[in-house]
C-alpha cells in the first residue's frame, strides 16, 4: 500500500508494533522460508514451504495463537 510521506514514520511504528506481537519463532521460520525460496525454482520453493509449514503447525506458539484467537484474548507466545 502507498503511504503519504508525512505519515510514513507513524505507519512504520504501527506496523512494527503489530509484528512485535507475533510469535518470534513463527516470524523466524517465515523469514527463513521466504529468503530460502528466493534462490529456488518454484517447485522447490513450494516443497520447502510445505516442509516449513509442518514446523509452524507443530510449534507451541501456533497452538497458543489459535487458542487465543478462539478465546478472544491476547496470545502469550513463548518462542517454542
Predicted regions: what they are:
Residues 1-47, 54-55, 60, 76-80:
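C-terminal long alpha-helix characteristic of the crotonase
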Residues 66:
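Flexible, glycine/charged-enriched surface loops at secondary-structure junctions
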Residues 72:
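Conserved N-box asparagine in the HATPase_c
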Amino acid at each position: 500500500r502507498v503511504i503519504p510521506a508525512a505519515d510514513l514514520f507513524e505507519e512504520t511504528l504501527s506496523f512494527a508494533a503489530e509484528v512485535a506481537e507475533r510469535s518470534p519463532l513463527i516470524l523466524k521460520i517465515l523469514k527463513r522460508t521466504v529468503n530460502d525460496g528466493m534462490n529456488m525454482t518454484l517447485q522447490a520453493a513450494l516443497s520447502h514451504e510445505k516442509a516449513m509449514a509442518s514446523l509452524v503447525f507443530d510449534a507451541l506458539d501456533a497452538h497458543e495463537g489459535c487458542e487465543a484467537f478462539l478465546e478472544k484474548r491476547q496470545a502469550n507466545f513463548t518462542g517454542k
